[in-house]
């Protein structure tokens, strides 16, 4: 997943 990705995080900002």
From Swiss-Prot:
Top-level lineage group: Eukaryota
Entry GO CC: extracellular region
Main location: secreted
Entry's localization field: Secreted
Post-translational modification: Ocp-4 has D-Ser instead of L-Ser.
GO MF annotation terms: hormone activity
Descriptive protein name: Cardioactive peptide Ocp-3/Ocp-4
Organism: Callistoctopus minor (Octopus)
Organism placement in taxonomy: Eukaryota, Metazoa, Spiralia, Lophotrochozoa, Mollusca
């Amino acid at each position: 997943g990705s995080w900002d």
